[in-house]
């Protein structure tokens, strides 16, 4: 998971 998700 990306940090913005």
Swiss-Prot record:
Q: Which UniProt keywords apply?
A: Amidation, Amphibian defense peptide, Secreted
Q: Where in the cell is it found?
A: Secreted
Expression by tissue, per the entry, reads: Expressed by the skin glands.
Q: Looking at the keywords, is Secreted present?
A: yes
Q: Can the keyword Isomerase be found in this entry's annotation?
A: no
Q: Name one GO cellular component term.
A: extracellular region
Instruction: Report the residues modified as Phenylalanine amide.
Output: 5
Tell me the GO BP annotations in alphabetical order. defense response
Which family does the similarity line name?
Belongs to the frog skin active peptide (FSAP) family. Tryptophillin subfamily.
Q: What is this protein called?
A: Tryptophyllin-T2-1
